[in-house]
Amino acid sequence: MESSRGKPGLNGSGGGAAAFDYSSRRGYYTGAGAALPPLAAGSRAPPVDPCCVALRVFVLLGTLASAVVMAADRQSTTVQIAAGEQLAPPLRVPVTAKWTYSSAFVYFVVANAMVFAFSAAALAAVRRRSAVVPVMVGDLVAMALLFSAVGAAAQFGLLGERGNAHVRWAKVCDVYGPFCERAMAAVVVALIAAFADLVLLMLTILTIHKASSYY
């Protein structure tokens, strides 16, 4: 009967016809009826994109520079405080600004140090096929850490630069000028590193998408 005939290319009848290998999860196309054995796990290293490596090196160096600059940021100066009596000379009081005095700056240093450590580990595992997905997930977490740390540090820096008239918080960057400049420089470098990590994550996703046999 007509219904009992096998369909060429699906059950092996019809020699020379194009066929698919359904023995593996991906079903590799052979084009000649012969099954193509799937690659063994870890049998071949994934291709390395030089652009991705360059971006990761930039993130590594950028987060290191941001963490070091912020952690070394310290300034001691002297401010004048007017005495109660008009004829009395103003009092000269020594004051010090350090990054540890701000929880936003502490979080900034810790986040950059964590991203630096992850970037170094990711560079060491760049040739391992089994590390592609864990590194991609780590890049997502690192990007979130960087953007949140940059936002917190930038908000505190703007508060020191401009103050807040609504709650009568005076600006302090006119007193601690070099301290604020170094802190904002570290924030800018970390922001650029965060965008570089974003581009790196997008390129990694595109590379995996192109290399996948599903599409």
Curated annotation (Swiss-Prot):
Residues 1-51, 125-130, 207-215 are cytoplasmic. The chain crosses the membrane at residues 52-72, 104-124, 131-151, 186-206. Pfam families: CASP_dom (PF04535). Keywords: Cell membrane, Membrane, Transmembrane, Transmembrane helix. Residues 73-103, 152-185 are extracellular. It is a multi-pass membrane protein. It comes from the Eukaryota. It is found in: Cell membrane. GO terms for cellular component: plasma membrane. InterPro entries: CASP/CASPL, CASP_dom, CASPL. Homodimer and heterodimers. NCBIfam families: A_tha_TIGR01569. Belongs to the Casparian strip membrane proteins (CASP) family. This is CASP-like protein 1E1. It comes from Oryza sativa subsp. indica.
